[in-house]
Design a protein with these regions (language model features):
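Metal-centered catalytic cores of metalloenzymes
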Residues: 2-4, 69, 73, 163-166
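Extended, charge-rich, solvent-exposed interface segments
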Residues: 2-59
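Divalent metal-dependent catalytic cores for phosphoryl transfer on phosphate-bearing substrates
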Residues: 64, 85-175
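A ubiquitous short alpha-helical element
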Residues: 10-15, 66-68, 124-128
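Active-site flanking loop/helix segments enriched in acidic
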Residues: 54-75, 118-123
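A Trp-anchored, charged/polar loop motif used as the substrate-binding/catalytic surface
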Residues: 82
Length: 175
């Protein structure tokens, strides 16, 4: 008989360990949340802490991109790197808003998709009816309410999640 295998031993995986990417993103959100006047990054920290197990294994899609175990984490990790690069170029950007929006932009996929231990994704009823933009925006609004966070920056964060597909043809809720 062969060795005992787990889902971690099989299938496609991102080139970096999911735990490493998760900790990198959460550490960055915590750093932002520790700054005076921080608001939306506190929402990001709470969402990441609450959904750690799913974030570590969820696929980013059923078939479009990063459709494998840990694919969502890898996608977000790479987008965070791109956002950090934008902050180096455009000093007018708000680091807390941009990085929190990137960290949370696809968080609704945790309810839009059901991902098995191998990383195979299928759409949930909620996902088919609402989509991850609406689901993610709602998750953020509920977490912010629970934390007592409100204000314009929260509205901007919610807008980023609702608008991140850019145009209606790609499924954006607002532009």
């Amino acid at each position: 008989h062969g060795p005992d295998l787990s889902p971690d031993d099989c299938g496609r995986h991102p080139p970096l360990r999911e735990e490493v990417m998760y900790e990198h993103i959460l550490d960055r959100l915590r750093e932002l949340a520790s700054e005076e006047g921080a608001t939306v990054s506190r929402v990001g920290v709470a969402v990441y802490e609450e959904h750690k197990d799913a974030l570590l294994r969820w696929s980013a899609a059923k078939g479009m991109h990063h459709n494998h175990r840990g694919g969502l984490m890898f996608h977000i990790y790479r987008m965070m790197g791109a956002a950090e690069g934008m902050l180096d170029v455009y000093d007018s950007l708000d680091p807390e808003l941009l990085l929190t929006a990137v960290a949370l932009h696809d968080i609704g996929k945790l309810a839009e998709l059901d991902t098995d231990d191998m990383g195979t994704a299928s759409y949930t009823v909620e996902g088919q009816l609402l989509g991850h933009l609406a689901i993610g925006e709602d998750m953020v609004a509920q977490t912010a309410a629970r934390l007592g966070i409100e204000g314009e920056k929260l509205l901007l964060l919610r807008h980023c999640l609702a608008a991140h597909h850019g145009i209606p043809e790609y499924g954006t809720i607002v532009t």
